[in-house]
Amino acid sequence: MLQYLFGGDRMYEFFKEQLDSKVKNHNLRTLREYCPIDAVRVKRDDKEYLMMASNNYLGLTFEPRVIDGALKGTKQYGTGSGGSRLVSGTFPLFTELEKELAKFKNTEKALVFNTGYMANVGTISAIADKNTIIFSDALNHASIIDGCRLSRGTVKTYSHCDIDELKYLLKQVDRNTRKLIVTDGVFSMDGDIAPLDKLYELSRDYNALLMVDDAHATGTIGNGHGTAAYFGLEKEVDIQLGTLSKSLGSVGGYVAANSTIIDYLVNTSRSFIFSTALSPADIGAALAALHVLETDASVLARLQENVNYMADQLISMGIDATNETPIFPILIGRNEDTLAVSDYLYEAGIIGTAIRPPTVPIGESRIRLTVTAAHNKEQIDYVCQSLQNAMKQL
């Protein structure tokens, strides 16, 4: 039946040719199974590995207080939500989490989505339409790019963090045209921080909405509240988006904004309206993790101490590591060389994933290393020494 629907063997041959091309270009992706031991160690084929590739920045996935939050949510409300938020899936836990997120982000309201990807896609496609011009950073996350496409608005992509180019593009547009400037707060593959203060000035000068995706900024930079807080712009940024799945150790996404925007999304965002709500365990874990972040300063302090320590070690090796975030891109270049470094680290008991196109531009393949609050200095030393040894093999 499938062969009939897709044009018989010829269509399957097309798929096979595409996969063969990826193999030839050292760009084939496969799934690799890991069994977590704790926040930084995993097991595979009876061998233990040090995880240096996850976004579990605060190490909260094994935090007893967060696990307890998930268990309490399940015991009180069951294993699943059973419906979409607008039908039957809005439990008291959701309301509590959204109030806490709004308070955390210093906004009037917040709205929880099932993933950060769905939050970006659902928000951008709702607030922008064919009459909107969207100004998007060249290195924005794929979910922002897809949201822009779904909106059917005109997209103007500016070079990465290039304020002068963005200003030039804004000047070409009538002031009364609907405009949206959207950026990652911390860029997921480079680890640098968007110049949000300058973006805000342009949004004000050219009458544009400003949206920031804080997926990798929440729980990592400044006081942990995200990029807007880092720049002192919590009240000025129109839309703050984030995830529950990275620093907060659960799963899900959210949007924080004023009441008008949130109420509008409830009524227009398709990825919100037509999705079954997250499970009570997910929401309970996120609530508990948010409480840990807000009340236990030692967790964020440990992360930032480890970030500084790892940056110092990499700089001593001649690697540029001047950012303030837990993301350390080790630029290699060619796919095959990047895979070779990743394989060397793997043999040394370290998970350091090779990031290749289309996730990053052609010729900019890299090892993306991340450090968390749960790593210790001995582990960081071992990773840096192993990386140095791996680079010598190229």
PLM regions and their residue ranges:
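Active-site phosphate-binding strand-loop segment of PLP-dependent enzymes
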Residues: 156, 160-212
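N-terminal "arm"/small-domain region of PLP-dependent enzymes with the aminotransferase-like
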Residues: 2-17, 24-77, 208
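Conserved PLP-anchoring active-site segment centered on the Schiff-base-forming lysine
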Residues: 123-142
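Active-site PLP attachment segment
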Residues: 229-264
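Conserved PLP-binding catalytic core of the aspartate aminotransferase-like
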Residues: 301-308, 315-349, 364, 373
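Conserved N-terminal alpha-helix of the aminotransferase class I/II PLP-enzyme fold
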Residues: 68, 72-115
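Amphipathic alpha-helix from the class-I
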Residues: 281-301, 315-317
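PLP-dependent enzyme catalytic core of the Aspartate aminotransferase-like
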Residues: 4, 8, 64, 68, ...
